[in-house]
Design a protein with these regions (language model features):
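Hydrophobic ligand-binding cavity/cleft-lining segments
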Residues: 1-47
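Amphipathic alpha-helical protein-protein interaction surfaces
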Residues: 14, 24-27, 102, 127, ...
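Hydrophobic-ligand binding "helix-grip"
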Residues: 29-30, 37, 42-44, 55-103, ...
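Generic recognition of short, well-ordered alpha-helical segments
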Residues: 23, 92, 121-122
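Amphipathic alpha-helical hairpins
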Residues: 9, 87-88, 129
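A short acidic/glycine-rich loop-to-helix N-cap element
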Residues: 111-133
Length: 144
């Protein structure tokens, strides 16, 4: 995943709490300003979300995206991949968690493609802004 933007933050909460928040996709709108609605379309036999449609508003980017989720690396890793969208042609990423005892290191990787002619530099800048905002809001929610 070398073409992905990424950032890492340390959250002052145990991994069990951070993963509980991250894995509760339906409640993302409670803590993420850029995700305004989540509609679950599929779950696995364990009840985990494997497909969902998210309404996102990240800066100038507003779209409704259908994502598939891969839980093979859980609880240390949750991956997602774009299935369908209006503006986006790609939205692949992962949350990677590292247990530090009373704290958790969280890395968010994201790669986005758009259907409009936008310079890659601007797309990468928006990816980084989205990542940093998501990590800051996750930290605030988990520590608050």
């Amino acid at each position: 995943m070398s073409d992905m933007s990424r950032s890492t933050i340390v959250i002052e909460a145990p991994m069990s709490k951070v993963s509980e928040v991250l894995f509760d996709l339906e409640n993302y709108p409670e803590w993420s300003d850029s995700i305004t609605k989540v509609k679950v379309s599929e779950r696995d036999e364990g009840g985990r979300v494997t497909g969902a449609t998210l309404t996102i508003a990240a800066g100038a980017l507003k779209d409704e995206v259908s994502l598939s989720y891969n839980w093979d690396g859980a609880p240390e890793r949750l991956e997602f991949e774009l299935e369908d969208a209006n503006m986006l042609t790609k939205m692949d990423g992962a949350y990677i968690l590292k247990d530090l005892g009373d704290e958790t290191e969280v890395t968010y990787e994201l790669s986005v493609g758009v259907s409009m002619p936008i310079p890659q530099m601007m797309v990468t800048k928006q990816e980084k802004t989205t990542i940093d905002q998501a990590l800051a809001q996750l930290k605030e929610h988990c520590e608050g």
